[in-house]
Amino acid sequence: MGSFEDRKATGTVFNIQKYSVHDGPGIRTIVFLKGCPLSCKWCSNPESQASHPQVAYNKGRCIGCHRCIKACEHDAITVNEDGTLSLDRGKCDVCKTLDCAHACPAQGMIIYGENKTVDQILKEVEKDALFYARSGGGMTLSGGEPLMHADIALPLLREARHRRIKTAIETCGCIPWDTLKEAAPYLNYVLFDVKQMDSEKHREGVGVGNELILSNLKKLLTEFPNLHVQVRTPIIPGFNDNDEFAYALGEFLKGYENVGYEALPYHRLGTQKYDFLSREYAMGDVSLPDGVAQRIQRIVDETRGAVTEEKK
């Protein structure tokens, strides 16, 4: 067994997703840790952004029993004229018990986020050990930004390695270098998001500049040349769906052999969760024209001199 301290470390998990084949090699279990330093306008997991557990209201499941109102000690829930409910998010966000959700018999009120120990998380992950062994898969830490919570992410990676579970991480890169450096020896694979090369445009889209992100990526590629890094970009309409971005990223990645690249087309999955959290989806009804992500992929690959499967 690993250290007692590592096994008992705790953090807030909002989902454990099994049988994933898109977030690292093989069949994987993804552990989603809550909390992120970025505020991406297109985020498909808005419940991942705040670090604390949150209550969400799904009016489609509400049966109008009002047990949630009776259970709430903060008078945070009111009934609208159409029978739906409104939540005072200022009161909900400081609530420690979320009694409204526990009282709901229909899952109209649900909780995003649950405190779990490393032992509890890995007990769930290990259930699919046979699939990992046969496919070369393992556990992927995601978020949010998993390394924002080093007090749970690092013990989880160490203990997974101790239990011979292959590990990967999805990161936005906006974390202290020392944290990423400490995590790297316990990782088999890194999925590293680069959303924009221009810092001001980056700030407009996600709330912070990109200097730390690009610095961390360069250090990771340089100091850990045997660690495979897959850079990924969600291609967002009006944000990074242009050739200028693609050429700049290709130049940045030129010369590194331990890095792959994937351009991911924009999608609208997860927009309903904004309603559940009483938030507006900032992207509206925009869509990405067919072929744009493929064009970005081609430009990045050609600029950095990568050999794609099509060229072979």
UniProtKB/Swiss-Prot annotation:
EC number: 1.97.1.-
Catalytic activity: glycyl-[protein] + reduced [flavodoxin] + S-adenosyl-L-methionine = glycin-2-yl radical-[protein] + semiquinone [flavodoxin] + 5'-deoxyadenosine + L-methionine + H(+)
Obligatory cofactor(s): [4Fe-4S] cluster
Keyword Transferase: no
Keywords: 4Fe-4S, Iron, Iron-sulfur, Metal-binding, Oxidoreductase, Repeat, S-adenosyl-L-methionine
The Radical SAM core domain, residue ranges: 22-309
Residues reported in the UniProt entry to bind S-adenosyl-L-methionine: 42-44, 144, 193-195, 267
Entry note: cofactor: Binds 3 [4Fe-4S] clusters. One cluster is coordinated with 3 cysteines and an exchangeable S-adenosyl-L-methionine.
Subunit structure: Monomer.
Protein name per its UniProtKB record: Isethionate sulfite-lyase activating enzyme
